[in-house]
Amino acid sequence: MGGATEDDVAQISFGYGTFTGALGLHGGLEKIGASVIPMSSGNTNKQIMFLTDMGVTLLVATPSYALHLGEEIRKRGIDPSKDLKVHIGLFGGEGMTEPMRDEMHKVWGDQFVCTQNYGMSELCGPGVAGECTELCGMHVNEDWFIPEIIDAKTEEVLPPGEKGE
């Protein structure tokens, strides 16, 4: 899961309501033996307190909230890339563009591994597709889904191995 291991302390900053991202990632992280802090969403001051005081190594959030947290941490005179242990970001709930990923590295450090996942609360929450640490695009969970990849211009179905949408 994005490079997470049993040695990680994960802070989940997704809501634990009807959005299934929090519970899905919570369960997956516990399954690999990571410690999980179920922060839920909001309360930026408390989020920052836990990030700094609990030795958090992995942040689960939307990419925009991770950037917001980084900005707020910097306002306190703390450099997230040097003063915190966070080295992995598992992001979902919204898309992460390459410029956002570049900004993540500026805020959280060059060694910060940030991957994104895709899910739908109506089906299974997180787990439809996700990036690995190679960051070459998302992998569809083929145990559950059969993807149909099409050419964006012609809308024709592409053969296996071809890139499309």
Task: List PLM regions with ranges.
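Short hydrophobic alpha-helical segments of the AMP-binding
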Residues: 10, 29
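Conserved coil-to-alpha-helix start sites within the AMP-binding
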Residues: 14-26
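Conserved adenylate-forming
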Residues: 1-9
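Active-site glycine/GP-rich loop and adjacent strand/helix microenvironment
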Residues: 32-165
